[in-house]
Amino acid sequence: MAGSTIIEASAINGQTYSSSGQSIEIIKNSGTDYIDSLFSDYYEGPRKWNTDPYLDSKYSKDGSIVISYSIASDTALYSPDYFAMEDNSVVYEPIPFAETQKVDIRAAFTKFSEFTNISFIEVNEADNNAGSIRFFINSLLSSTIGLLGGAVGDQPDKNPQAGDIIFRPEFADKSFAQGLVEGAGTYSPFAVLTHEIQHALGIEHPGDHRTISFPEEKIFTKYTVMTGIEGDAQPYRKDGIEYGVVQASMVYDIAALQYLYGANMSHNSGNNTYFYKPDTPFIETIWDAGGTDTLDFSNFSKASTISLIGGEYSTIGFDVDWSMSNNLGIAFNATIENASGGAGSDNITGNPSGNILKGNAGDDTINGKEGNDQLHGDGGNDFLYGDGGNDTIFADGGSDTIQGGAGLDTIKYA
């Protein structure tokens, strides 16, 4: 559980709205390298925001942590020591956010609330009030702030700029939208926005930690948006127009943030079926808090490799000219029980929950893994392996190869 051992309860953040008193604390590492390597090692442990004592009673849901944010205007105010860096070479020229950008920023916080136990509350900047997380577009030119990449987000701390997110002027006309976004590139403005919000919530780049290593094979944006290494990411082209396939927080981002703040155990807690369009590429991670759930690719014609194991990825075969390995993740501690393949020759792997796995058409390979599973090859010449548990394997059609594996298995013929 996040914050199980407090090392230090810090002072109040220095640039927050006047009635708040939002504070931070430093907690112990989780003991899991792929989580702890995403935290700063310049303190005794990772830093996180405590719930806002002024807003908590009104906005906390089921014990959620309340964190305020604000979107600075072109008349934003600062505490006198806000820009107290190593030198005084800062030049500030305010640029207001467009209304569409504000809508997209709010939508980003909605995404974060889906998988973390955080309620984000927007406060208006007026009369010296500002949120603990604060957004700007401006022309800060000091090299001490490190804006060479176009944006910066400060970690939770007690100094005035802690939690603040600053974009360079070139973002003034950018779209922070999600989905397929025209001209967004392979690392979209929304990915930059997500990256910086995650800094403001307390996580760092993989590879920054001096003693704990992030898995080297996972240092790509499809595993964590905290890296700038894109791997096999590519734009999607349709009718002569190039679109960015926009991604949000991925498997390892979610793991680190859930350690800090806990998980939203209400999100998708019922019985959910995840449908996708074969002509619409995506990169995403599923957080599902409960119920009996299904990944359904029955409307796809190309082969997919589908894994229901938490923390692992699936490679989805789209019916358009776009491909990327490992584009769909399932968060650690999320359980998806069932999966349906499409018309291609799919490879489907279950988990210990007791799965219903359907290959549909094509020559499929299905592995139930542990648990009491139901395996359906359906059409095609399939390979069906029950593995552990007491499985029921259906030889539905075609020349199937069946291996029961461990347990008391049953084979049923069509």
Regions found by a protein language model. Give the residues of each.
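Disordered inhibitory propeptide/activation segment of secreted metzincin zinc metalloprotease zymogens
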Residues: 1-97, 148
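Extracellular, beta-strand-rich repeat scaffolds characterized by small/acidic residue-biased motifs
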Residues: 290, 299-301, 310, 340-345, ...
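A short, flexible beta-alpha/helix-coil linker loop
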Residues: 74-79, 89-92, 171-175, 232-233, ...
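Low-complexity, polar/charged sequence tracts that form flexible coils or short amphipathic helices
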Residues: 163, 169, 184, 277-278, ...
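Beta-propeller domains
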Residues: 281-344, 349, 353
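Metzincin-family zinc-dependent endopeptidase catalytic domain
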Residues: 25-64, 100-237, 241, 290-294, ...
